[in-house]
């Protein structure tokens, strides 16, 4: 599974500026989803890869980004 890492409080994606390989996105994806996850900046949001099927990613049901 893949997807944008999401802030549970506001429903927004984790933003990033440096597209492609991005240490911030990689670190945040690993913190949220475990050591096996990958991450990079895609379309100014942190995109996480190699996730488990039940991983919660953006968009959150019934929670819109404010």
Curated annotation (Swiss-Prot):
<keyword id="KW-0872">Ion channel impairing toxin</keyword>
<feature type="disulfide bond">
    <location>
        <begin position="29"/>
        <end position="48"/>
    </location>
</feature>
<comment type="similarity">
    <text>Belongs to the long (4 C-C) scorpion toxin superfamily. Sodium channel inhibitor family. Beta subfamily.</text>
</comment>
<dbReference type="InterPro" id="IPR044062">
    <property type="entry name" value="LCN-type_CS_alpha_beta_dom"/>
</dbReference>
<dbReference type="InterPro" id="IPR003614">
    <property type="entry name" value="Scorpion_toxin-like"/>
</dbReference>
<dbReference type="GO" id="GO:0090729">
    <property type="term" value="F:toxin activity"/>
</dbReference>
<keyword id="KW-0800">Toxin</keyword>
<feature type="disulfide bond">
    <location>
        <begin position="25"/>
        <end position="46"/>
    </location>
</feature>
<dbReference type="GO" id="GO:0044493">
    <property type="term" value="P:envenomation resulting in negative regulation of voltage-gated sodium channel activity in another organism"/>
</dbReference>
<feature type="disulfide bond">
    <location>
        <begin position="16"/>
        <end position="41"/>
    </location>
</feature>
<keyword id="KW-1015">Disulfide bond</keyword>
<keyword id="KW-0964">Secreted</keyword>
<dbReference type="InterPro" id="IPR018218">
    <property type="entry name" value="Scorpion_toxinL"/>
</dbReference>
<dbReference type="GO" id="GO:0019871">
    <property type="term" value="F:sodium channel inhibitor activity"/>
</dbReference>
<dbReference type="GO" id="GO:0006952">
    <property type="term" value="P:defense response"/>
</dbReference>
<feature type="domain" description="LCN-type CS-alpha/beta">
    <location>
        <begin position="1"/>
        <end position="66"/>
    </location>
</feature>
<dbReference type="InterPro" id="IPR036574">
    <property type="entry name" value="Scorpion_toxin-like_sf"/>
</dbReference>
<feature type="disulfide bond">
    <location>
        <begin position="12"/>
        <end position="65"/>
    </location>
</feature>
<dbReference type="GO" id="GO:0005576">
    <property type="term" value="C:extracellular region"/>
</dbReference>
<protein>
    <recommendedName>
        <fullName>Beta-mammal toxin Co2</fullName>
    </recommendedName>
</protein>
<keyword id="KW-0738">Voltage-gated sodium channel impairing toxin</keyword>
<keyword id="KW-0528">Neurotoxin</keyword>
<comment type="function">
    <text>Beta toxins bind voltage-independently at site-4 of sodium channels (Nav) and shift the voltage of activation toward more negative potentials thereby affecting sodium channel activation and promoting spontaneous and repetitive firing. This toxin acts on human Nav1.1/SCN1A, Nav1.2/SCN2A, Nav1.4/SCN4A and Nav1.6/SCN8A voltage-gated sodium channels. Also, it reduces the peak of sodium currents in Nav1.5/SCN5A at all potentials. In vivo, is lethal to mice when intraperitoneally injected at a dose of 5ug. No activity is observed when injected into crickets or woodlice.</text>
</comment>
């Amino acid at each position: 599974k893949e997807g944008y890492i999401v802030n549970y409080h506001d429903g927004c994606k984790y933003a990033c500026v440096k597209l492609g390989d991005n240490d911030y996105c990689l670190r945040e994806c690993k913190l949220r989803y475990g050591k096996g996850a990958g991450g990079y900046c895609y379309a100014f949001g942190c995109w996480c890869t190699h996730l488990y099927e039940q991983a919660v990613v953006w968009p959150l049901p019934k929670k819109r980004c404010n």
